[in-house]
């Protein structure tokens, strides 16, 4: 494989991992803010909100993990 294609693979993997990480960071920030807002409004629902918070945070955090796997696949398997 010539070096231009290899360079494009590295750049595409970096873009995939970078945008997924930025998106997850923004999503977790918004999620945390909404959790605090909901907990401040109705303190008696904190256990329910906390459970839902951690479930959704796990789903949001899974996206960058998948993109890291795809990025590593692009770097090592496709080159």
UniProtKB/Swiss-Prot annotation:
Report the GO molecular function annotations.
lipid binding; proton-transporting ATP synthase activity, rotational mechanism
> Source species, please?
Wigglesworthia glossinidia brevipalpis
Q: Which UniProt keywords apply?
A: ATP synthesis, Cell membrane, CF(0), Hydrogen ion transport, Ion transport, Lipid-binding, Membrane, Transmembrane, Transmembrane helix, Transport
Q: Where in the cell is it found?
A: Cell membrane
Pfam families cross-referenced by the UniProt entry: ATP-synt_C
**Could you give the subunit structure recorded for this chain?**
F-type ATPases have 2 components, F(1) - the catalytic core - and F(0) - the membrane proton channel. F(1) has five subunits: alpha(3), beta(3), gamma(1), delta(1), epsilon(1). F(0) has three main subunits: a(1), b(2) and c(10-14). The alpha and beta chains form an alternating ring which encloses part of the gamma chain. F(1) is attached to F(0) by a central stalk formed by the gamma and epsilon chains, while a peripheral stalk is formed by the delta and b chains.
Q: What is this protein called?
A: ATP synthase subunit c
Q: Which family does it belong to?
A: Belongs to the ATPase C chain family.
* Organism lineage: Bacteria, Pseudomonadati, Pseudomonadota, Gammaproteobacteria, Enterobacterales
Alphabetized Gene3D superfamilies for the sequence: F1F0 ATP synthase subunit C
